[in-house]
From Swiss-Prot:
The gene is HtrA2. Residues 42-54 have a biased composition (Low complexity). This is Serine protease HTRA2, mitochondrial. PROSITE patterns: PDZ. Changing residue 80 to W: Reduction in levels of cleavage. It comes from Drosophila melanogaster (Fruit fly). Residues 18-74 form a propeptide. Residues 29-55 are annotated as: Disordered. Its main location: mitochondrion. A motif (IAP-binding) lies at residues 75-78, 94-97.
Amino acid sequence: MALRGSHRLEVIFKRCIASPVLHSHAANRRSSQLAIKEGDPNSNGNSGQYQQNGEQKEKGWRRLVRFFVPFSLGAVVSAAIIQREDLTPTIAASKMTGRRRDFNFIADVVAGCADSVVYIEIKDTRHFDYFSGQPITASNGSGFIIEQNGLILTNAHVVINKPHTMVQVRLSDGRTFPATIEDVDQTSDLATLRIQVNNLSVMRLGKSSTLRSGEWVVALGSPLALSNTVTAGVISSTQRASQELGLRNRDINYLQTDAAITFGNSGGPLVNLDGEAIGVNSMKVTAGISFAIPIDYVKVFLERAAEKRKKGSAYKTGYPVKRYMGITMLTLTPDILFELKSRSQNMPSNLTHGVLVWKVIVGSPAHSGGLQPGDIVTHINKKEIKNSSDVYDALADNSKTLDIVILRGVKQMHVTITPEDP
């Protein structure tokens, strides 16, 4: 459009250039003829004078044309550029609108399955809020609905080994219900809860065996008690053995992902792009390294739990309940140590083993004693701690208190904890 406009102006300018010349020649001819008809003796000389005047006028017109034409052409070019700049954002915006619609696959996944994700609160029945008079929240986690009649799947560490507490579940629509623990398997860190509600949105279960490294996944849950939180990433590994993570008595190949899984995400679903749960969010080591229990392993737990319920007994396996300290921990394997040292300059270079404290329950003995997430336990009661089994053994001792040596950054510190009896 701008080019057509510039072409029209060019034609007009050519006509303007030609018309002054024609006009001056016609004027000269008319003046010469008038002089001859009147019989002026100096008519020949006057006609030459008129011709000179015409030539001067012609030169003047040419000067004006030469002066105005560049400005006019510059205006045309500027108008074309401005018009093109005006059109460019419109075209880009239309393309971006289509791109947003075509590539917003994470939002499509969330829209299809977020209603089945729940927020789980563990209420301390011994301590009450000063203003509301309600039990305070000792810890929290996530879960997701697997049956319309109120059966919820979560991690065992979210709901058990917490004396003097009660469990509450908040749905995505804000409704809150008390929950009862039905099935527990501490070995696999899985548990089911029941709330007395029907016609709930159910999460579809996929197949973790078909996953590939690099596949997109979405983690749903309530990190740091922030309900309905969505993070996304890819599957980093489909076969991360529990032995690599220093987890005792667990024959599980975990799913490793770089999707952010923070405190409170535990028990929530790890979902594929078809909106199917392919894992249960379990733990985080550091930013970009988190783990989930494969859904194929979870299905075995659910089948056994259903058989037990048909027989009238709950499905409970795992270790005997020991004294309660209130932490979630992870053994520092060589691979994990290497990753931590590469991400943090505060890690001592001579550290070769220990246990990482990655969660501390508020109000627990560990919290009261001063343990913090990120601390590394190296000794308990003067015994070297190499893995999480050593911590369990220390809890099984008859010692009333635990004198714990920790590394916090580059500083070595001592804390004293008095575990609670079961």
